């Protein structure tokens, strides 16, 4: 399942709209709306729009996840449902999770760096590190879906999602798992992400 600029909503209509967009060669890239780009050379991106976390996660779980993890959990739940998987019928120790993120949460780093400068080190969110590190997408998917098999966080920049799927294929092929939730997640459309990537022309 894919969360994309045109498929963030959870209903069947949006998934069909996304697929129709692919067939019709529609572009999901537009002007950045998440922050002011006046001082940036790059002003466009493929933002995920209409993502309502309250429709996807309970409030307690959502508060302990950054956006990249929320995307991963939402897409994984949708993929599970579309595949007709039922954890009550699966051995949880044979169901793994290979969901990677190339960069984790730059938003958390931006937010807490600002707090550090304004209020001092003692005021940094104690959950900063577990919120921002890239393996938390995989960890949160496993927790939310009850997966207890192999867990792997692949970090290979823009190849992360494809690499994760390849590693999952190999693990199933050699008998390490029966089912693996695999893919990649990213939420780097923020001042630091766009600024840094634009300077190296990515």
Q: For each predicted feature, which ranges?
A:
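Conserved beta-ketoacyl condensing-enzyme motif
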Residues: 19, 23-156, 188-194
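Local beta-strand N-terminus motif with an aromatic residue
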Residues: 9, 94-95, 177
